[in-house]
């Protein structure tokens, strides 16, 4: 079974969105300028793996709204994005954003399901111990 591991919330104005999530929920917002992306840290995170310490908790991100992400998106971790893109197409879904490398963390793609909902796929890259 594949689990939800991340979320993304689009914004139109980054400063306004950052302030909202900091002030309302107490989230820590970290900017990744090379990707124009903001990590939304919602729980204590292991500094080595960047994964939440609390079982069942997830962190996420804030990003500029675009055509593939007009609404919040959940990311589901899969062992192979390529295999899941094929499964999605075979089951009536569509690829809306091709696979891209995200830093040295993993691979990411966006798909739509049979109902038009956009979902992110995440393939984690194994980090050296």
Give residue spans per PLM region.
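N-terminal beta-strand motif that seeds the catalytic metal site of vicinal oxygen chelate
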Residues: 1-19, 71-74, 123-129
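Active-site beta-strand termini and strand-to-loop segments that position acidic
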Residues: 41-44, 111-114, 124
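Vicinal oxygen chelate
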Residues: 12-14, 74-118
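Conserved catalytic-core motifs of GNAT/GCN5-like acyltransferases
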Residues: 28-34, 99-102, 126-129
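Short, charged/polar surface micro-motifs in flexible loops or helix N-caps
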Residues: 44-47, 67-69, 80-82
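Short acidic/glycine-enriched loop/turn segments that link adjacent beta-strands
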Residues: 34-37, 68-70, 102-107
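Core segments of cupin and vicinal oxygen chelate
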Residues: 8-56
């Amino acid at each position: 079974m594949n689990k939800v591991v991340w979320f993304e919330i689009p914004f139109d104005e980054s400063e306004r969105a950052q302030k909202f999530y900091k002030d309302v929920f107490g989230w820590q917002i970290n900017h990744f300028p090379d990707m124009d992306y903001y990590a939304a840290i919602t729980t204590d995170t292991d500094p080595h793996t960047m994964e939440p310490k609390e079982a069942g908790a997830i962190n996420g991100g804030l990003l500029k709204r675009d055509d593939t992400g007009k609404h919040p998106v959940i990311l589901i971790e899969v062992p192979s994005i390529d295999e899941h893109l094929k499964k999605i197409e075979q089951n009536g879904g569509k690829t809306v954003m091709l696979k891209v490398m995200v830093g040295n963390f993993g691979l990411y793609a966006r798909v739509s399901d049979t109902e038009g909902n956009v979902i992110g796929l995440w393939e984690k890259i194994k980090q050296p111990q």
